[in-house]
Regions:
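Acidic/histidine-rich, surface-exposed loop or edge segments in extracytoplasmic proteins
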Residues: 16-24, 84-99
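Bacterial Sec-dependent signal peptides at the C-terminal "C-region" and cleavage site
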Residues: 3-21
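Short, solvent-exposed, charged loop/turn and helix-capping segments
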Residues: 47-50, 122-124
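Short, contiguous alpha-helical
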Residues: 30-34, 41, 51-94, 134-178
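Solvent-exposed, charged/polar functional surfaces in cytosolic regulatory/catalytic domains
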Residues: 39-42, 46, 112-120, 160
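Acidic/histidine-rich alpha-helical segments that form the ligand environment
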Residues: 32, 98-134, 142-153
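Feature for soluble, non-membrane regions of globular proteins
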Residues: 17, 119-123, 175-178
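Short N-terminal segments immediately surrounding and downstream of signal-peptide cleavage
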Residues: 16-38
Length: 178
């Protein structure tokens, strides 16, 4: 029986099994981004004012800079993937980190970036998710993959901030897979 299943695997492509692997529909991606936004908010809520400016070592970003880096990338990837213009006030957040030194200002800037991506996904034309675009004038990928790369990026950098919280004696939020 197992041999029969294994023998038929080459006859089935991943696209046949799950077409969303190559061209995800915006709806499931919206749910993931809403969950990621809520999870990131938990990290921001866990941080104290001291944590926002904290750098575990002098040569890496502070907690606040990590969060602003996420926000900048959310805007850049979201804009490239959707064609939606980045709001004028949203460019170069990380370079303007001093303006976001308070928990309230930082949280608003980061949450606004998630709202931008979520809105871009909700407004996305499903038929265009498979279109090829160029990110950073360098990487060619589909619109759907650009949204996926943005998701991967924000997950990576949010995960990096776990150690910032732990080094300040704060228990980070529990994993939020669902």
């Amino acid at each position: 029986m197992m041999l029969g299943i294994v023998a038929t695997l080459p006859l089935t492509s991943f696209d046949d099994v799950n077409p969303t692997l190559t061209k995800p529909a915006p709806e499931p991606m919206v749910a993931d981004w809403e969950r990621a936004k809520a999870y990131t908010l938990e990290y921001l809520n866990a941080a104290t004012d001291e944590v926002i400016s904290f750098k575990p070592t002098s040569d890496i970003r502070s907690f606040g800079q990590q969060m602003l880096h996420i926000a900048d990338a959310n805007y850049m990837f979201g804009s490239a993937a959707s064609g939606k213009a980045i709001p004028a006030a949203a460019g170069g957040l990380e370079e303007s980190a001093d303006k976001y030194a308070t928990k309230e200002a930082l949280t608003k800037a980061v949450m606004d970036s998630y709202d931008f991506v979520i809105s871009a996904l909700k407004d996305a034309d499903k038929t265009k998710m498979g279109e090829s675009i160029k990110i950073f004038n360098r990487f060619e990928m589909t619109r759907a993959v650009a949204f996926e790369k943005a998701f991967e990026h924000q997950t990576h950098h949010r995960g990096q901030t776990t150690i910032y919280l732990r080094l300040k004696g704060i228990k980070p939020p529990n994993e939020k897979l669902f």
